């Protein structure tokens, strides 16, 4: 007898769709069963104001194969983001958060924030109007080891922000360490975190042992197994502070398989299926719905989706590559079997 599991339609609380001709592919994959997604603003040029965010949202809507998927837009914080722009974004009703990228931390973050001191007026305005702060939690100093950047960020940057803005809702995105799990668990109810499928499925050995696997290279970088296990424990615990955010971040194959390859894993082709595999292995399939469908909207003060999707325990083969505009993207688990599929 085939095993099935029906859950409330999930959402993706951290997604990169990119822009231009690739939107038809990225929007197709996510909108297949995600009700909503928080859209990252690190385009070129970045989405730094309300007008740019609304124009980007219109392009996403135009790329939808069918109606029903809602992109939740964000602003890209810079040293020059004003309190007035935050208020304007909030008033639009379409912009739900602002994203703090430390300058140079990840893809297209060169225009990011150089010092939290420079965005204090924007943060105060966000606290006043109820706009969420989304954070890429890594320091970028060249003398800091790449595997330590999240841990040091928690101490040096995030802790002071949390202390200075006690009513600001904060999402520490794509957490990768036991340190981040502990920080979020010990913080107030205004602090939460997203966890990606690839940080749950893989650790740095998967990326580096027996040959380097560029399609597992992402930022924040995969960490030790002990950190992977801490993430699995957090995600499958039922704790309301942790929720689904794929950080699905496609790059064309030639940008990944290169002497200096780009950071990012493409998981939107099989997002909920990947999470289901992890939760099943942890003996926690009963906790998947809260993680994928309840905790995110609850934290954002948005209604949960009213419809459902059904997962079936049925193997299928992930293709070697997928269309990405006029190029190709190699998805996570390319040429491998998935154990679950969405009906």
From Swiss-Prot:
PROSITE patterns given in the database record: DIHYDROOROTASE_1 (PS00482), DIHYDROOROTASE_2 (PS00483)
Catalysed conversion reaction: (S)-dihydroorotate + H2O = N-carbamoyl-L-aspartate + H(+)
Its biological purpose: Catalyzes the reversible cyclization of carbamoyl aspartate to dihydroorotate.
Name of this protein: Dihydroorotase
Residues reported in the UniProt entry to bind Zn(2+) 1: 14, 16, 99, 247
GO biological process terms, semicolon-separated: 'de novo' pyrimidine nucleobase biosynthetic process; 'de novo' UMP biosynthetic process
Gene that specifies this protein: pyrC
Family that this chain belongs to: Belongs to the metallo-dependent hydrolases superfamily. DHOase family. Class II DHOase subfamily.
Pathways per UniProt: Pyrimidine metabolism; UMP biosynthesis via de novo pathway; (S)-dihydroorotate from bicarbonate: step 3/3
The organism of origin for this protein: Psychromonas ingrahamii (strain DSM 17664 / CCUG 51855 / 37)
Superkingdom, taxonomy of origin: Bacteria
Entry's EC annotation: 3.5.2.3
């Amino acid at each position: 007898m085939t095993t099935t599991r029906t859950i409330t339609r999930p959402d993706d609380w951290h997604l990169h769709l990119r822009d231009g001709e690739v939107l038809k592919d990225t929007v197709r994959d996510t909108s297949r069963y995600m009700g909503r997604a928080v859209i990252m603003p690190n385009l070129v040029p970045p989405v730094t104001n309300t007008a740019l965010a609304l124009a980007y949202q219109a392009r996403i809507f135009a790329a939808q194969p069918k109606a029903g998927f809602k992109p939740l837009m964000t602003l890209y914080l810079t040293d020059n983001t004003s309190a007035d722009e935050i208020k304007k974004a909030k008033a639009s009703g379409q912009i739900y958060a602002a994203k703090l990228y430390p300058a140079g931390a990840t893809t297209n973050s060169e225009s990011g924030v150089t010092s939290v001191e420079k965005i204090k007026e924007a943060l105060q305005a966000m606290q006043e109007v109820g706009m969420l702060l989304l954070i890429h939690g890594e320091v970028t100093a060249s003398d800091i080891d790449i595997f330590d950047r999240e841990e040091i960020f928690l101490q040096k940057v995030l802790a002071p922000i949390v202390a200075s803005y006690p009513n600001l809702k904060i999402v520490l995105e794509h957490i990768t360490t036991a340190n981040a799990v502990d920080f979020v668990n010990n913080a107030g109810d205004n602090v939460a975190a997203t966890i990606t499928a690839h940080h749950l499925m893989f650790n740095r050995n998967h990326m580096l042992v027996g040959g380097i696997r560029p399609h597992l290279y992402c930022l924040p970088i995969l960490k030790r197994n002990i950190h992977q296990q801490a993430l699995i424990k957090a995600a499958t615990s039922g704790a309301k502070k942790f929720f689904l955010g794929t950080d699905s971040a496609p790059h064309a194959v030639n940008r990944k398989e290169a002497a200096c390859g780009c950071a990012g894993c493409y998981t939107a082709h099989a997002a909920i299926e990947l999470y289901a595999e992890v939760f099943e292995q942890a003996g926690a399939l009963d906790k998947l719905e809260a993680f994928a469908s309840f905790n995110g909207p609850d934290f954002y003060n948005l209604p949960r989706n009213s419809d459902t999707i059904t997962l079936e325990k049925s193997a299928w083969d992930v293709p070697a590559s997928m269309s990405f505009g006029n190029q190709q993207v190699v998805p996570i688990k390319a040429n491998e079997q998935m154990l679950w599929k969405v009906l």
